[in-house]
Amino acid sequence: MINSFKKLIILISLVIILLSSNNIFIDSFKIPVNQKNVKSSGDSSYQIGAGIYDITGASAEVNLMGYANPLQVGAGIHFRQRARAFVFVDSNGNRAVYVSTDSCMIFQEVKIHVVELLQDIFGPNVYTEANVLLSGTHTHSGPAGFSQYALYGITSLGFYKKNFDTICNGIVQAIVKAHKSVQPANMFTETGELWNTNINRSPFAYDNNPEEEKAMYDSNVDKNMTVLRIEDMNGNPFAAISFFAVHCTSMNNTNHLISGDNKGYASYLWEKQVNGPGTAGKGPFVAAFGQSNEGDVSPNTRGPTCRDGSPCDYKTSTCNGRNEECWSLGPGKDGDMFESTQIIGGNQFNKALELFNNASIQVSGPVQYRHSWVQFTNVSVEPPYNSGVDNATTCRGAMGYSFAAGTTDGPGAFNFVQSDNNTSGNPFWNFIGDFIAKPTPDQIRCQSPKPILLDVGMVEPIPWVPDVMPIQIVTIGQIVLVAVPGEFTTMSGRRLRNSVREIIGESIENPIVLIAGLSNTYSGYIATFEEYQVQRYEGASTVFGPHTLGSYMQEFGKLAQSIVDGTTVPAGPTPRNLTGHTLFFLPPVIVDAAPDFDDFGEVSIDVNLNYSVNETVSCVFYGGNPRNDFMIESSFLSVDLLTGTDQWTTVLDDGDWDTKFKWKMHDLGFSLITIEWVIAPDTTPGTYRITHSGFAKKNPFSSNLTPYQGISRNFVVQ
């Protein structure tokens, strides 16, 4: 075990010099809401509840999860991240819960611990691993450190239990809220196409799929969005769930602020339009924009270009042989990542609202679910799922060379390129890979044509990636949620949906099969057998080898058949418990300091006296390290409006889009907190102030924290 930790430390050191970054900026707009009611039938189809809770982790000094860029360390909050939970109960008392979280993914240990906490509250039979479905939106702008597996904790310097607990507790509290708010309800659904919002970032790999299969579809990405409208017995909507495939990478790897990215922004827009100002993350209306098969799907709709404006190489996504020079830009002006987030999130919101208002297909039928754990390192893949290969099996986990190349959403560094099938590789990186774990001849054959860079499944005594996968299907009437533990590419998702639909259609009329992406654990990417052959990023990150998709189709097919037959499925092997086998190398906050003659909360640079709309208010405070207290269900800032004699009303906080909370460590060792507010055009004229709240650790020999607050001088918005 010690040798494994030494190897991890050495790899961390190498990774810290591996990746590079770039720069980009902001704007904002408002989107009008035009809601209407759809008349419900007289009888309730279900009992449904919805809940929302804060899961925002450390906003300072912790690496952000997603791009694996060690230089992308958190330094504040743009807007908070939430868990949105929906409990469904049918007339027979069968229940299931779907949770969409503003997190990069759901890790195995998160799902297991959430179920443990729920069973502590409700007993062993209400919420189980079988009827709890947890899904991440895949934002790349949330704090990392919440996985116990080494590969996903390298750039975060290990497992940060405080982040892990924040996410788990937030999910549980969202479910508790949903559980307590269950009421007679009806659900309606509608599906439509959303364009100008996603593109395929690996068309070279997609094009390797069979011509007759590609001819079945109008695009190389899924354009369908499906929306679930949930309303009470008076026809008043209180929740919505949308499913649409697009990466949450509108915010690029130069961003250092916590953000829900485009899907989080879409949720924020809808909830705020319905619930009103000053209600970010508070409900009662809850809107989730769930993830789907986004593996090769980018929101950066301008596509990849070289920095000089010339096109990137189609096969390798390089410029003059270097992948660092090939970037995809979003639709914002000059590629502005904040504006791009608004546009892509706004597009999803607008389409979802349109479908929501026109939803006419009533959802009815029982709540059902099946769940199995499957050891995925040696699954025998049988026809028709074996791609015509005899004795097809999955492999122990491995990452290919193109994994290190990154994608056009966030390129890697050095001499790695996509579509690299060169098994001789680079002697230096071969040495590094062999140092971690040297691939065996059987492993090389099994993973072929992938040239193995990191043999993560062969590391002893504990693999660097999970190898026991949760396979889960949840049905709510004709809605079939296929909970996939990873990132399915466009064509992989289509094949899985089609295969499940064909089976489950024997017992469910006109089933609407939806991929719930990045659910219950994370196992990297799932490319088709054909896409795997060209080894772009998605194929190189298909952990269990070329037959990974076939094995998932086979195992999900077993669950679908079980639902048709009304039978149970085996629980499967118990996944590893890595508690006590993790390390975290980021030092704790020892003590906070403030300049001489100043105290925590004192203003360093005050606001101006007068502002107009579209201007940015800025105030700098001396503060404490935000890692002291994450301010869950609270805020590091408030924008307050004077509404009466000495009466202040908070109109914005750090859960809002128009504000930014920024942290910086001063050279002399104290924290500088900058609060920014971009004044929206519809802002009420009046007298305002900026407030900053936090906790300081004044004594290095005590764990006690001291709350503090700072207030700017008053200013006028005209």
UniProtKB/Swiss-Prot annotation:
Residues 1-20 form the signal peptide. GO terms for molecular function: N-acylsphingosine amidohydrolase activity. Glycans are attached at N224, N252, N358, N378, N391, N421, N422, N577, N610, N614. The active site is at S298. One of its GO terms (biological process) is long-chain fatty acid biosynthetic process. Its main location: secreted. Belongs to the neutral ceramidase family. GO terms for cellular component: extracellular region; membrane. InterPro entries: Ceramidase_alk (IPR006823), NCDase_C_sf (IPR038445), NEUT/ALK_ceramidase_C (IPR031331), NEUT/ALK_ceramidase_N (IPR031329). Hydrolyzes the sphingolipid ceramide into sphingosine and free fatty acid. Its EC number is 3.5.1.23. This is Neutral ceramidase B. Pfam families: Ceramidase_alk, Ceramidse_alk_C. It comes from the Eukaryota. It is found in: Secreted. Keywords: Glycoprotein, Hydrolase, Lipid metabolism, Secreted, Signal, Sphingolipid metabolism. It catalyses: an N-acylsphing-4-enine + H2O = sphing-4-enine + a fatty acid.
